[in-house]
Amino acid sequence: MRDLTSATDSASLESDSSRNQFIINSLLPWYSCSEHEFPHRKARKRRSPKNLDWSVSVQMPLVTSKTKESEKSPKSWSAIAKKHVQGDSPVKKSHSVPVPSDRSEKKSFNSSLGELIETYSPSLDAPRPIQPRGFINTGNICFMNSILQALMYCVPFYNLLKQINRMVPYNFERTTPLIESLTMLSRDFREYSEKFDLQGDSILPEVVYSATKGNPRFEMLQTGEQEDAEEFLNLFLDELHEEFVRERRHYLLKNDERNPKSDIKISNGIKSGLDSFDDQSSVEASGWTEVGKNKKPVIARSATVERSPISQIFGGQLRSTLRVPSARDSVLLEPFQPLQLDIQAEDIHSVIDALEHMTAPEILPEWHSSKGNVTATKQMYIESLPPVLILHLKRFFYEASGGTQKNYKPIAYPARLSIPQNVFSPSVRGSIHPEYDLNAVVYHHGTSASGGHYTVDVQQLDKSGWFRIDDTHIHRVPIHDVENSELSADPSLSKLGHGDRVAYLLFYTRRS
């Protein structure tokens, strides 16, 4: 190493040129180029900052200036948070999930979900298979676990959740807690492009459980009481329906469109419709006139349900006809969800038997009319069927001597269900030929209506196989163990202590 204090170096420092050469050759050897070849950095004049106006509407594209650089989307979602909407309401915070790139406008949660509801049509297209995951039972919630599994493996319902995840930003205000909880739960089920054998880790459906807190409909979840799976399904779908209806109304009102008619709950709509047949005078009080059999005029009324994705997926319609001597026939169109099937009669041994029994005429003695008490008849037909047909096999009945009892009768149900034409109303008979594929079966184990245990068999979304799910226990089963499964002995059930299993809820999806 050179001695920087040598006499030679001291002399070289006396002149500027020598000093520069010394620095180049000794101290900074990487600056080895000559002075005239050295790439001097060009001086640039710093531009003065511009005051940008971020007061833009969420309905307009984000434009901050006229330069090409500013025409691009903001690089950070924090920049969007600095904006505010024209008017009184600020921009709502959104989840970290970005708005789809195919949309040129930034939409709020309400407008996005409302638009989706207004334009929604159920999709029967099979998605990719998902990895099965068990649900942890924290105590007497097997009824909820079984219903949630059946819904997750229902193709139109899963496609709906997937569509919401893709198109609607997260809502931090929790105005639709059940919708948001289900979309979040669906993200825990990973999709696969190839077949797989291993199941995912079991999870606690805490997000759904939390969404029910404070809702009086789901008080049984907070008290730890066992609940009937069919009753929970009805309450759950009703609440989902109402959340969708509220968002649709908000969207229509915001866009200055017509105000929808009053909402009628699906489960209550059926009951109120039947109660309206109490007497002939109430039947004739409202409704419209139809031309019935032999061109005889009939009074027709309808218990309508406001449209939502839930009613579009699961909701069907029944036609109930009341015939009273010396009076016009009365017709009531009633919604159903699910379809209740009585199986108590001795001649009912299959789902088809139960459907045909449902449409048999019912004798109503001592019917009160304007001409006194008469014998009337009431007959029920299917007017329309939904994409997903849920059949409730009414296993429990009441006896004055023994209270609520359970019917263990084996009921045959096929993997492919063809609805017979004689169960449809004459007005639609012959015009529709629906066929359904079985995709989930919810079972009840035990003797008590207020207790016991629930499990479920579900078909993979792409129809590649079946899984038997008992809370966190999952294993594959062949289709012949699912079809009419209560007629066959299953060794695994004996080991679990559930040898009294019977089918309780059947989920059928219409063939596309």
Swiss-Prot record:
Listed Pfam families: UCH (PF00443)
Span of the signal peptide: none
Active site per UniProt: 142 (nucleophile), 453 (proton acceptor)
MF-aspect GO terms: cysteine-type deubiquitinase activity; metal-dependent deubiquitinase activity
EC number: 3.4.19.12
Keywords: Hydrolase, Protease, Thiol protease, Ubl conjugation pathway
Reaction catalysis annotation: Thiol-dependent hydrolysis of ester, thioester, amide, peptide and isopeptide bonds formed by the C-terminal Gly of ubiquitin (a 76-residue protein attached to proteins as an intracellular targeting signal)
Stretches assigned to the USP domain: 133-511
GO biological process, one term: cytoplasm protein quality control by the ubiquitin-proteasome system
Record-linked InterPro entries: Papain-like_cys_pep_sf (IPR038765), Peptidase_C19 (IPR050164), Peptidase_C19_UCH (IPR001394), USP_CS (IPR018200), USP_dom (IPR028889)
GO cellular component: cytoplasm; cytoplasmic stress granule; cytosol; nucleus
UniProt similarity note: Belongs to the peptidase C19 family.
Protein name: Probable ubiquitin carboxyl-terminal hydrolase 3
Source species of the chain: Schizosaccharomyces pombe (strain 972 / ATCC 24843)
Name of the encoding gene: ubp3
